[in-house]
Swiss-Prot record:
This is Ribosomal RNA small subunit methyltransferase A. Disulfide bonds: none annotated. Keywords: Cytoplasm, Methyltransferase, RNA-binding, rRNA processing, S-adenosyl-L-methionine, Transferase. Coiled coil: none annotated. It comes from Chlorobaculum parvum (strain DSM 263 / NCIMB 8327). It is an enzyme of class 2 (transferase). The lineage of its organism: Bacteria, Pseudomonadati, Chlorobiota, Chlorobiia, Chlorobiales. It is found in: Cytoplasm. InterPro entries: KsgA/Erm (IPR001737), rRNA_Ade_diMease-like_C (IPR023165), rRNA_Ade_Mease_Trfase_CS (IPR020596), rRNA_Ade_methylase_Trfase_N (IPR020598), rRNA_adenine_dimethylase (IPR011530), SAM-dependent_MTases_sf (IPR029063). Gene3D superfamilies: Ribosomal RNA adenine dimethylase-like, domain 2, Vaccinia Virus protein VP39. S-adenosyl-L-methionine binds at N20, L22, G47, E68, D90, N110.
Amino acid sequence: MTKVEYKHTHIAAKKKLGQNFLLDKNIPRKIVRESGIKEGDLVLEIGPGFGALSTAILEVMPSFTAIEKDPELARFIREEHPEINLIEGDFLKVPLEPLTGSGKLAVLGNIPYSITSPILFRLLDNRHLIESATLMMQHEVAQRITAVPGTKEYGILAVQMQAFCDVKYLFKVGRAVFKPRPEVDSAVIRLVPKAQNPVEDSEGFRTFVRRAFHQRRKTLWNNLKEYYNTSEVPAETLKLRAEALTVEGLIELFEKLTPIDHALNDPETRNGIE
C-alpha cells in the first residue's frame, strides 16, 4: 500500500478506489483553462482527492461543489478548502438534479481508471443536466472515445459517446506526475452533450451498437440478423463491418431496423466498453 503525503497529511492510496493522486500544479490549471469555466458557472468536481484540481478551480471562482467518496480525503478537503461545497458520497449514486439549480453543470475530474466506464455512462444518462465535462482518464480510453471509423480503437465506446456528445481529445498526461505512479499514461478529453438527441430511442440505440460490434470481425448482417428485420437496409451496407460506418451511418442504419420480438438476450452488459 502506498502512502501519500501532502501538507503534513498522510493517506494510504486505496487500490479499490483506483486512487492515483495528481500532485502537479500546472496540469490542473491547464485542465481548467481547457474547460472554459468562469465565475458564475455551476461547477462539479468528481473526486477531488488532495485538491490539486480543486485549487486550480478556486483560482477561477470562489466556490463550487465536489463529490468525494473517501472519508479521509473528504475530511481533508473540508479542512483545507471550507469554501468548497463538499458532498461525501459516491458520484455514481449522488442525485445530480438538485445540484443544477436553474442551470447546467460543468463537470471536471481526474476520474479513477477502475470506474471510468460507469462514470461516463452516468454522465451520458444525465446529459440533460450537463453543460460540459472535462475529464482526465486512462489514455487508452480517451483514444477509444475520440476514435474515428476504420481504426482498431473505434468501437462501442466511441459510437455511444460521439452519438450524444461532441468529443475532443485535449492533451496527454504522463504517468510520472501521479502518486502512486500508474502503469499507464493519462489524457484529458472534453465532452459537450448535443442539444438534440440524434435518436428517439436512446436505449434501443445503445443495445443496437453493442450488438453491431459484438464480434468485430463479423459483418453487420451476421451480428444483427438474430435481433432485427433488415429488409429496409441495402445489402451492400449489411456486408460491411460495424467499424466501417461513421456514427451518423450507424444512426441511419438503426433507424431502418425493426426489432424481432423473439430476439436473443443481449450479448453484452449495458456499460461494457469492449
